[in-house]
Structures are given as C-alpha cells and as structure tokens.
C-alpha cells in the first residue's frame, strides 16, 4: 500500500541517498533536451531565472524532457549512494508549472557489481540530447522495465509554492541499489530525494572505517537545533561544496552580552547545541575529524564528542544512558579540518555537542567495527 503525503512526513528525517552530495548519480536518461537529468539530484534549492534561455529553450533548474512526438514515455535510471531500504521519496516540481510531468512511477532493483558495470558511462553535458542506441541496448539487458514497482503510476502536482512538494511513502523492506524514475509521458521534475536506511556490509574487524558515515549505515537520531542545516549533512561521504551542506544552528539567544574565556581557552557560554548519531556498526573509535569547511564567521567555539552503548536499540529522548567522554571540549577554527586521536570503549551512538552555536560541515569517527557475535 502506498500513501501520498501533503506535509513533510517523518521519513524526511532519515538519511537521503539520491542527491549529489550523498553520492547518487544518473546512469541513463531517455531525454535531456531542455534540462539534464543530473540537475534533479542537485543539493541546492531549485531557482527560476526569468530571462535565462539556452540554445534549446527556456533554462529550467531540474530535469526536463522535450515534448513527446514519438511513442513511449521518458524515464531515467539512478544509482543510489549505497544499498538501502527506501522509506519515502520527495518529488519537487518547483517552477515547473506548465511543463511538469503529469504522472510518475518508481521501480527499483538491487544490482550486483557485475550488473552495475553493464550500465553505460554518462559523461559530459547532455543538454539538448536524447539517448543513443548503444546506451539503451546496455540498459535493456538489465530488464529495467521489469524491476520491482515501489510506487505505482501516481499524479504529480504543478510547481507552485503550495503544490510543488510531492511526498510519497514507500512500504517495503527490500534493499535496493538503483531506481528507475518513469514520467508519463514527458515533462519536468525539479528535484528528487530518496529517504531510507543504508544496508552496509560489515567490514573485517581489522579494517579501519568511518563508523558514523552515511555509507556505513549511520543515522541521525536526534538534535537540538537545525535552523539552517540538518545534522545528517555532517555524515555525507564527500567534502561539502557550500555552507548550506552542513549542520548549522541559529544563534543562541542566551549568549552573554560580553564574551569571556575559561582557563582552557574555550568560551564561557551557558548554552550549547547537540546531535545524536547511531553508528553504522558497534565499534571503538580511535580518530576523529571535525571539518568546519565554509564556516568562516560562524564556526563553533568548541566541540565535544561523547559515546554510549545501547545494544541494538535506537536513541530516543527517553533513553536512559550515561554518555562517556571521547573528545573533551576542543577549540575549533574557521574553514578547516581538525584531527584528534582518541580512545573509546565499545559504542553504538555518539553525541556531538557544539558550544555555543554555529556550523560544522563534516564529522568523521574512524575506528574498528566489532562483530555482534564478539560483543
């Protein structure tokens, strides 16, 4: 059973796997005439520039195909950042008012590395083009039209402010690596987001990994403030491109009129902001990186990191636990990586606390996963 949502549903707090910064990418599209499919995965909010045109027509911030004058319908194949269970989607038609795709459906598959290697290479600017027969033949061999249907044919709404956001809950526990987005018959979509839970394969116990990475299956399970940017941005695998792609809080209203410092150099402030993450695997942390890239006039004064072991449980505000110190309050500076060696007990969760407020681009917690049968 599938449900259409009209307000931001709970699944939008989960990790996201289609956007460029998460590692999603387009591997095939039937048509990119007015606007290339890659723009649908952009991290930025869609914009509209009234007098901007290309040699092919009106510039649009999203994926837009030409008006169909041949049989069939348009579709594309996306590779997700990692294998995941899909819990919901957002299809944003912003500014596509007379040219949005009227209907869509979503199919999905879990491809082997060998099957993934059969996908065509998609390089260069595809604006003004359609598929070539060689690429289509590669995709046809994977029977994409027979993939699991996770969203049946469903109407889309036009890209006005009050109708642009089309949320779609998905009820399935299958894990997938690729999706096929069908639009009927043609038109445009500004942005696509895929929310869910990563299903990473446990690494060998002697291999160091980033335990809090999106690709390891880590998730954000709570936070105090996300006014300008969600804490889940910090666990994306790639370096951030802008300040918008990080965790940034509002300025705290309880900050002192005149700032003073503690003996260790950190500022005397009454408040702080926090975010809790469940690690991809239980593990022991040996090295931490806190990246303040792009945060130049709004980086936190200091950061501390604590850990806790909750077994298989998720963290909730009602969780009874004692947080153990992994990284004591440590000074931060603008627009750079901060590396710390550390030693932690076995932990399943971490709490990142900044004081008093500000922004952090990325956080990495390198260490070793502990297999469940060894716990």
What do the PLM-derived regions correspond to, one by one?
Residues 79, 169, 276-278, 341, ...:
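Generic structural detector for well-ordered beta-strands
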Residues 274-294:
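C-terminal, well-structured subdomains that either form a transmembrane helix-short loop-helix hairpin
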Residues 69-80, 266-280:
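Short beta-strands within extracellular/lumenal beta-sheet-rich domains
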Residues 1-71, 87, 95-151, 157-162, ...:
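Juxtadomain low-complexity/linker regions and immediately adjacent membrane-anchoring helices
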Residues 78-84, 242-245, 278-283:
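Helix-boundary capping/turn motifs
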């Amino acid at each position: 059973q599938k449900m259409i949502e009209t307000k931001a549903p709970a699944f939008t707090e989960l990790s996201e796997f289609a956007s460029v910064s998460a590692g999603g990418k387009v591997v095939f599209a039937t048509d990119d005439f007015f606007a290339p499919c890659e723009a649908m995965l952009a991290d930025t909010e869609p914009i509209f520039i009234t007098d901007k045109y290309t040699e092919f027509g009106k510039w649009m911030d999203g994926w837009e195909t030409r008006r169909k004058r041949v049989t069939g319908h348009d579709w594309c194949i996306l590779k997700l950042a990692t294998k995941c269970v899909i819990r919901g989607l957002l299809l944003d038609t912003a500014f596509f008012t007379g040219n949005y795709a009227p209907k869509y459906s979503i199919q999905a598959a879990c491809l082997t590395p060998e099957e993934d290697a059969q996908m065509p290479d998609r390089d260069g600017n595809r604006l003004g083009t359609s598929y070539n027969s060689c690429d289509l033949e590669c995709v046809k061999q994977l029977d994409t039209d027979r993939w699991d249907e996770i969203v049946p044919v469903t109407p889309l709404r036009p890209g006005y402010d009050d109708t642009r956001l089309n949320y779609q809950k998905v009820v399935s526990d299958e894990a997938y690596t690729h999706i096929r987005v069908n639009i009927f018959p043609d038109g445009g979509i500004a942005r696509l987001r895929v929310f869910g839970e990563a299903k990473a394969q446990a690494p060998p116990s002697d291999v160091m990994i980033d335990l809090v990475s999106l690709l390891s299956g880590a998730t954000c399970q709570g936070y105090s403030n996300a006014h300008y940017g969600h804490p889940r941005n910090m666990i994306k695998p790639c370096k951030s491109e802008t300040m918008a792609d990080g965790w940034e809080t509002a300025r705290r209203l309880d900050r002192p009129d005149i700032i003073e410092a503690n003996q260790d150099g950190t500022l005397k402030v009454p408040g702080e902001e926090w975010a809790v993450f469940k690690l991809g695997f239980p593990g022991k942390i040996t090295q931490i990186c806190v990246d303040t890239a792009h945060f130049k006039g709004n980086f936190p004064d200091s950061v501390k990191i604590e850990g806790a072991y909750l077994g298989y449980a998720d963290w909730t505000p009602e969780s009874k636990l004692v947080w153990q110190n992994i990284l004591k309050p440590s000074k931060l500076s603008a627009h750079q990586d901060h590396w710390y060696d550390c030693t932690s007990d076995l932990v399943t969760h971490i709490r990142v606390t900044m004081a008093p407020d500000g922004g952090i681009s990325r956080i990495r917690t390198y260490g070793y996963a502990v297999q469940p049968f060894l716990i």
